Amino acid sequence: MKYAIIAAGEGSRLAEEGISVPKPLVKVAGQCLVDRLIRVFMANDAEEIVVVCNDLTPLVDEHLRMIERDGFEGRMIPLRHIVRTTPSSMHSFYELSEFLKDSPFVLTTVDTIFRDEEFADYIAAFKASLADGSADGMMGVTDYVDDEKPLYVTPLPVPPRGEAGECQFPLIGNFLDADPDGVCPYISGGIYGLTPKAIDTLNRCMAEGKSRMRNFQRGLIEDGLRLLAFPFSKVLDIDHAKDVEKAEEFLRTRPLTRPSGTLSPRGEGKVSTSNQEK
C-alpha cells in the first residue's frame, strides 16, 4: 500500500497561539505529527510514503531528509518528499499525484489524529474492498464533530446490487457543506483511500480551477466512483494549541465500543472553531 501525507499548510493559527515549530514537527504524545504518521503507515505495510511540505521553513524538509538518509526507529523508510508551497490541500495532492498513479493509496493531512488500531481495521477493510472489487475507494468518516466547517457524508439508502454486494460499509451518496436537518450520520474524517481512477478526477478538478479537498470529493461522486464509508470513533485535527492536549487525552483513553459499518444519526459532537478543510 502506498501512503501520502499533505504537510504543506502554513500552520498560521498554531504560530499565532505561541507554537513556534512548523505543524508537521508539533509533538503529540511525544512524537512529531509527521513521524507519527510514518510510524503508523509502516505498521500497515507501507510500500512507499510520499510527503509534500512547503518551503516557508527549511525545518520540515531537513527533518524528512534525515529520515530518508538515516531511517526511523531503527529501520530504513521507503520515504520520498517534495517541497512545494501550494494554495490549497487539493493543489498539494496534485503535486503528490505523479507518485500515486500506478496503485491504490491512502492520503491524509499531517495533523490527522486517529487511534492506531482503528486505522489498522480501516486498512484491512480497504484492502478487502479492493480485492472483491466492491469499491473505487474507502473514506474515513466519524460522527464526532470537531470542525467549524464539517463536510457531511450522506450514504446511499441501499447499496446497488452487484456493486457493494455483502460489504458491511455503505456507499457514499454525496458530500455536503451543510446538514440543517441533522440527518447526515457522519462527517468526513480527511482520510482518503483511493485508486488511480481518482487521479483522473483530480486532474479534471484542477483543469476546472477548483480547489479544496471537499470539492475533489464531490468530483469523485460526480464521476461515478464508488466510495465506501468506514467509521472511526473520532478523528481530530491539530489547528489550535489546545488541540494538542485534546489529542493526547483522546489517544490515552480507550473506546467502550468500536463503531460499526452501519451509518446512524450522528452522536453528540463538540463543535470547535477549526476550519480545517476536508
Residues covered by each model-derived region:
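Short catalytic helix/loop segments, enriched in acidic residues and glycine
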Residues: S20-D35
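A conserved hydrophobic position in a structured secondary element of the catalytic/binding core
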Residues: D55, T108, G193-L194, D239
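Conserved N-terminal catalytic core of the sugar/cofactor nucleotidyltransferase
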Residues: K2-I5, R13, Q31-T109, I113, ...
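Catalytic-core segments of class I nucleotidyltransferases/pyrophosphorylases
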Residues: A120-I123, C167-L236, K242-P255
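Conserved donor-nucleotide/metal-binding helix-loop-beta segment in metal-dependent transferases, i.e.
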Residues: E117-K149
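N-terminal nucleotide-binding beta1-loop-alpha1 segment
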Residues: M1-I19, L225
